[in-house]
Amino acid sequence: MKKFISIGTAIATALLFVAPLPSIAGHWYVGGTLHNATAGEWHKSSYENKLATAANWTLMDPNIRKISNKSSSMETVRPYAIELVACVDQVSAGDSYDKKYVSNLAAACMVSMGW
């Protein structure tokens, strides 16, 4: 009996690392990796990656974070993230921005949009 419990515990533990758990994984705002990217890297990245990264940036603004917390939904952040992606795309267009960090461009966009 003790052997079966050990095997069962081992299997359950292994499943914790393998089986998908209900989490935020797979949502539009998860998985952004462009926080320290250059504009050149930004333009080569997927829209999904840009949007997830922009979601993180938008939540740095206390007013947007407050709106998100009040609604208990990241969907309230989505329009801001979409707008921020569009702004960074537009501002960073052209070869002269390829080596500029998009985090700086995103900050400038947020200021220019009155966030």
Over which residues does each language-model region extend?
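Extended interaction regions within the primary functional domain
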Residues: M1-K2, P22-A25
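C-terminal segment of classical bacterial N-terminal signal peptides
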Residues: L15-S23
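Bacterial N-terminal signal peptides that target proteins for export
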Residues: M1-I11
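Compact alpha-helical subdomains of small soluble proteins
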Residues: W28-G32, N56-W115
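Residues in flexible loops and secondary-structure boundaries
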Residues: T9-L15, K50, D61
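N-terminal secretory signal peptides
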Residues: I24-D61
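Alpha-helical interaction segments
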Residues: I7, V18-A19, G31-T33, S46-Y47, ...
